[in-house]
């Protein structure tokens, strides 16, 4: 399928919705192309499903915030045109060996990575373009030569914030007509931290390293 949607208001349509109505003029509709292929078996006592998916996100608008060197004033870094690839496989099984017992399990293995490098511009809390986040100097205009920007080299880096391996097992026993007892166990792995920006006072390029992976 193909989806085109407006970016989120905060950090997308608006540069900093908490303090200003200034519109992000570079924001465009975010696009996603996705397909899924699956196969399932269903018997009286057993259900098994295997799916593979691929999603390509295009023109995402994202933002990051931090404090300038004075540690009192907030800045926002706005990025547009960010792409990402999400792909993986998913397996589900439900078994009912007797009318009183239900067993279930699932496994999801994903590979989610940023798919390009992005250009970021900096703004202060009043949505004024910044020339330097060390001093807080304001640029002459949005997109002007002195408007602080840099290229964020993130192509191939894992997307953070969501576990890319998930597994679960569980069971349910029917003791009486209206009484069930059950237990579930869920396992999360390959969870990568989202990146944070160091105090940064100049333009040029910033190359991200592979984010920290939660043990």
List each model region and its residues.
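Surface-exposed, extracytoplasmic segments of Gram-negative outer-membrane nutrient-acquisition systems
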Residues: 56-80, 110-155, 194-202
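Conserved C-terminal beta-signal and adjacent last beta-strands/turns
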Residues: 30-35, 94, 98, 102-104, ...
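A generic beta-sheet turn/junction motif
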Residues: 41-45
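Small/polar-residue-rich segments within soluble enzyme cores
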Residues: 38
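Extracellular loop and loop/strand-boundary signature of outer-membrane beta-barrel proteins
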Residues: 19-25, 34, 74-80, 88-90, ...
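Surface-exposed extracellular loop regions of Gram-negative outer-membrane beta-barrel proteins
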Residues: 1-34, 47, 54-77, 186-198
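Short glycine/threonine-rich catalytic loop with a Thr-x-Gly-x-Asp
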Residues: 84
């Amino acid at each position: 399928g193909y989806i085109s949607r407006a970016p989120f208001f905060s950090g997308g349509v608006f540069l900093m919705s908490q303090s200003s109505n200034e519109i992000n003029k570079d924001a465009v509709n975010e696009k996603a192309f996705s397909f899924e292929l699956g196969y399932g078996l269903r018997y009286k006592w057993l259900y098994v499903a295997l799916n593979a998916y691929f999603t390509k996100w295009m023109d995402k608008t994202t933002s990051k915030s931090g404090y300038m060197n004075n540690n009192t004033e907030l800045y926002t870094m706005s990025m547009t045109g960010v792409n990402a690839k999400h792909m993986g496989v998913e397996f589900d099984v439900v078994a009912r060996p007797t009318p009183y017992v239900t067993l279930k399990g699932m496994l999801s293995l994903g590979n989610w990575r940023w798919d390009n490098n992005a250009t970021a511009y900096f703004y202060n809390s009043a949505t004024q373009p910044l020339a330097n986040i060390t001093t807080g100097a304001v640029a002459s205009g949005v997109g002007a030569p002195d408007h602080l920007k840099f290229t964020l080299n993130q192509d191939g880096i894992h997307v953070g914030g969501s576990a890319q391996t998930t597994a679960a097992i569980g069971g349910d026993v029917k003791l009486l007509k209206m009484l069930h007892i059950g237990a579930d166990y869920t396992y999360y792995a390959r969870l990568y931290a989202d990146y944070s920006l160091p105090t940064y006072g100049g333009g040029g390029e910033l190359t991200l390293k592979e984010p920290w992976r939660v043990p």
